[in-house]
Amino acid sequence: MSFTNCLWVMAGGALGTLLRYVVSVLALPISGQLPWGTIIINVTGSMLIGFFGTLTLAGGRYPVSDTLRLFVMIGICGGYTTFSSFSLQTLDLMRDGHYLRAGFNVLGSVALCLLAVFIGYAMAATINAKTS
């Protein structure tokens, strides 16, 4: 982990978060009962990390430096959506034949994240109630 690579990841993350904001704002007119901005971000981020990650592998059609892969895949995609990393890691598990692990990754992540959100909500609601 070099300082230069950290700077590239940070720059990509800044770009990714800006893109996330822009897409979220652009999606506001179509958002109704569903958070379409988030859905669009998660789907396009997952597609981008799968496309770029595969195309730029050492054995891919357009191999690039590890630094550029860090910039795009961890920086931009990570700032844009963490769901893309989750999706890629789940696909990697399935491609390696670890279907049970992939299933646990999906179900476990969703269940644990929902539980964590609930716990965070409950803790904050308790604090809010005490200060009212």
Where are these regions (language model features)?
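Membrane-interface helix-loop junctions in multi-pass transporters/channels
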Residues: 1-132
